[in-house]
């Protein structure tokens, strides 16, 4: 199953996340198909950017969003 979820990047205690499309059987940070945005919780206010066109494409072909990505995207 294809899922849209967060992949952690950055360094120790300074994380930022990419919003990626990946196979659900893969590990959190490995082997994603496409990066469609990012989330930076360390900025004030929090920075979230998602390519809505690509998000809608992947949802249209059957990808499922994680709970956190649903909250961030507002869908």
UniProtKB/Swiss-Prot annotation:
One of its GO terms (cellular component) is small ribosomal subunit. One of its GO terms (molecular function) is structural constituent of ribosome. InterPro entries: Ribosomal_bS16, Ribosomal_bS16_CS, Ribosomal_bS16_dom_sf. Gene3D superfamilies: 3.30.1320.10. It comes from the Bacteria. Keywords: Ribonucleoprotein, Ribosomal protein. GO terms for biological process: translation. Belongs to the bacterial ribosomal protein bS16 family. This is Small ribosomal subunit protein bS16. It comes from Nitratiruptor sp. (strain SB155-2). The gene is rpsP.
């Amino acid at each position: 199953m294809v899922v849209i979820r967060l992949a952690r990047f950055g360094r120790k205690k300074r994380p930022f996340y990419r919003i990626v499309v990946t196979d659900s059987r893969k590990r959190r940070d490995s082997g994603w198909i496409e990066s469609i945005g990012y989330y930076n919780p360390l900025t004030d206010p929090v920075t979230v950017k998602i390519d809505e066109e690509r998000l809608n494409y992947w949802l249209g072909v059957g990808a499922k969003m994680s709970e956190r990505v649903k909250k961030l995207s507002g869908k």
